[in-house]
């Protein structure tokens, strides 16, 4: 509540800057979130695009490769990745990989002790973040949900995809998997590197750092350079950073907002910002998947989007598989791509990273994806809502009460 009051006051004081992108950039500077101006971005719109691009970048690594993922699924994609990493380690490239213990445990094809030992024997440093020890409840929250790769301190990746072949092949129960990842070259990579090294050094007790990990970077011409803010969520240090950045962006919107998120059970501050945007006439479109890989959450999501539909939001139920993308586009001028779901788990508990990109061209690419995916979606209407069973509506109502824990 205090954030909304402060941000509303802030918006009023800088409204003369006009554009929503300018408002949010000013907000981020006020909050101490660094803006970087010398960047090149490539959106990777499918799993195949991501892994082809990532593997090629790994082949060209010369000094170090850093990977931080929620999980590495023990399948053909992970095997190809670790083969590549082993080759680079043999060449003398430093290779460090980190994955979340819960993310691995919840994976139906986890990396087991024998797999980790084999990986280490090939010259790859691999670490499990926050292993489960007694009392286990102490480890239930604050999981590392980030997906970060940094190569030679010059090239970075982040977005919604872990390491698994279902990003290419899909899954039997939910069909084709849709997701968004991105490649960054330029100054924003320094912040991805800093996030990784902070976590790595904390978990291992090592002291990796120095100029070799933060090399001098080329300057890109203004015609291609893009402005990026890396917004990182660390539970104790920056617990509300991504939630506030989302709410600020929604609050600043002047024309339209498009959101795609797989587990749409947002915090009260984000819901309040959306309602306020609708009240002032901003067009709000939200896309959620019709099917999900997680039980219970979809019913809570349906309950929430139905409430927003009644206030004027357009809700699209994607039926072409599972849309796992975590993106938002505002006024066709700026967007965010990252790891954070719009649920309490991501916004209140886990380690997450989102890139806020102030560039119309990149934003328009995502707008185009949204418009294409509308063709494979059902618009939620009062009639469709009435067709839902009473049981599903009840489960959604209960889920809405439990959103602080989802």
For each predicted feature, which ranges?
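Bacterial N-terminal signal peptides
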Residues: 1-9
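Charged, low-complexity intrinsically disordered terminal segments
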Residues: 10-406
């Amino acid at each position: 509540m205090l954030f909304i009051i402060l941000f509303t006051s802030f918006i009023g004081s800088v409204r003369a800057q006009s554009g929503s992108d300018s408002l949010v950039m000013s907000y981020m500077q006020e909050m101490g979130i660094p803006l970087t101006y010398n960047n090149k971005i490539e959106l990777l719109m499918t799993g195949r695009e991501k892994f082809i691009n990532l593997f090629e970048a790994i082949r060209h690594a010369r000094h170090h490769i850093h990977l931080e993922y929620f999980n590495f699924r023990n399948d053909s994609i992970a095997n190809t990745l670790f083969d590549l990493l082993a080759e680079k380690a043999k060449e003398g490239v430093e290779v460090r990989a980190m994955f979340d213990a819960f993310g691995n445990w919840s994976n139906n094809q986890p990396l087991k002790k024998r797999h980790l030992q084999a990986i280490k024997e090939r010259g790859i440093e691999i670490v499990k973040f926050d292993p489960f020890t007694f009392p286990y409840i102490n480890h239930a929250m604050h999981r590392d949900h980030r997906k970060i790769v940094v190569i030679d301190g010059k090239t970075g990746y982040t977005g919604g995809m872990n390491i698994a072949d279902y990003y290419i092949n899909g899954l039997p129960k939910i069909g084709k998997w849709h997701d968004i990842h991105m490649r960054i070259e330029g100054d924003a990579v320094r912040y991805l590197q800093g996030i990784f090294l902070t976590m790595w050094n904390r978990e291992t007790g090592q002291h990796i750092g120095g100029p070799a990990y933060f090399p001098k970077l080329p300057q890109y011409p203004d015609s291609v350079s893009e402005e990026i803010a890396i917004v990182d969520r660390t539970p104790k240090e920056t617990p509300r950073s991504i939630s506030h950045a989302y709410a600020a962006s929604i609050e600043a919107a002047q024309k339209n907002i498009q959101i795609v998120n797989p587990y749409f059970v947002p915090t009260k501050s984000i819901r309040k910002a959306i309602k306020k945007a609708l009240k002032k006439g901003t067009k709000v479109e939200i896309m959620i998947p019709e099917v999900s890989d997680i039980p219970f959450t979809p019913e809570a999501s349906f309950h929430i989007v139905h409430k927003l539909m009644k206030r004027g939001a357009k809700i699209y139920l994607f039926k072409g598989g599972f849309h796992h993308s975590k993106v938002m586009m505002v006024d066709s001028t700026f967007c965010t791509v990252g790891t954070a779901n719009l649920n309490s788990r991501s916004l209140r508990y886990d380690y997450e990273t989102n890139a806020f990109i102030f560039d119309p061209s990149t934003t328009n690419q995502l707008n185009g994806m949204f418009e294409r995916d509308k063709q494979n979606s059902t618009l939620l209407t009062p009639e469709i809502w009435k067709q839902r069973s009473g049981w599903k509506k009840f489960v959604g109502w209960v889920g809405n009460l439990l959103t602080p824990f989802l």
